[in-house]
Amino acid sequence: MSQVSISKFGNPIERVDRAIDALVSGRGVLLVDDEDRENEGDLIFPAGNITAEQVALLIRECSGIICLCLPPERIEQLGLPQMVTCNTSAYQTAFTISIEAAEGVTTGVSAADRATTIRCAAALDARPEDIHSPGHVFPLRAVEQGVLGRRGHTEGTVDLMRLAGLAPAGVLCELTNVDGTMARLPQIITFADEHGFPVLSIEDIAAYRSQPIKKSA
């Protein structure tokens, strides 16, 4: 069990409040899950106004598998089928088929192109004809109950956007070390300190949603 803690970023309610403030201002946050689950930290940004610079940061510092987290109704609005009919992944991560914006991109792989695709698919009035498949952005379908139904980064991302009063669409990518290994909590905290990102956990979001009376004013 790691002795490193995110308590330096406040108590659970304070950590969520600080993450909300960052997201409302268009900045990113780092979301960690349980050490006994994936034991990873995802860098998250609001999807609706994501910039090429933010996508470039995800490509440079993270795994490169940039995912767009959406609730079920938005996935259905876009007409996106699941990547597989029988999901046998360890944590039931609900990938749909990958996507590309139908217009405004070239090869689709650059940071600018991926930002265009994300903004296109995240638009409240987005339609199936606005996107093509396959592509270089990977949508994820959150469960309807959010983190109260599944303790995943996908659900945490969508819940955070809703708590922030934003459209329920967020981008995530797993933070990695320079050597390509997955960043664990000590490296995640160091990265957060260096770049000024708030850190919170999926359990923080569950506590925030379950005990709204304890939200700070």
From Swiss-Prot:
Names of the cofactor(s): Mg(2+); Mn(2+)
Catalytic activity: D-ribulose 5-phosphate = (2S)-2-hydroxy-3-oxobutyl phosphate + formate + H(+)
Gene3D superfamilies assigned to the protein according to its UniProt record, in alphabetical order: DHBP synthase
Marked site (Essential for catalytic activity) residue numbers: H136, E174
Record EC number: 4.1.99.12
Pathway in which the depicted protein is active: Cofactor biosynthesis; riboflavin biosynthesis; 2-hydroxy-3-oxobutyl phosphate from D-ribulose 5-phosphate: step 1/1
Pfam families noted in UniProt: DHBP_synthase
Biological process according to GO: riboflavin biosynthetic process
Gene Ontology cellular component list: cytosol
Cofactor annotation comment: Binds 2 divalent metal cations per subunit. Magnesium or manganese.
EC main group: lyase
Keyword Amino-acid biosynthesis: no
Binding site for Mg(2+) 2: E38, H153
Keywords: Lyase, Magnesium, Manganese, Metal-binding, Riboflavin biosynthesis
GO MF entry, a single one: 3,4-dihydroxy-2-butanone-4-phosphate synthase activity
InterPro entries (alphabetical): DHBP_synth_RibB-like_a/b_dom (IPR017945), DHBP_synthase_RibB (IPR000422)
Residues the entry annotates as binding Mg(2+) 1: E38
Residues at which D-ribulose 5-phosphate binds: R37, E38, D42, R150, R151, G152, H153, T154, E174
Subunit comment: Homodimer.
PANTHER family: 3,4-DIHYDROXY-2-BUTANONE 4-PHOSPHATE SYNTHASE, GTP CYCLOHYDROLASE II-RELATED
Family: Belongs to the DHBP synthase family.
Protein purpose: Catalyzes the conversion of D-ribulose 5-phosphate to formate and 3,4-dihydroxy-2-butanone 4-phosphate.
Record's protein name: 3,4-dihydroxy-2-butanone 4-phosphate synthase
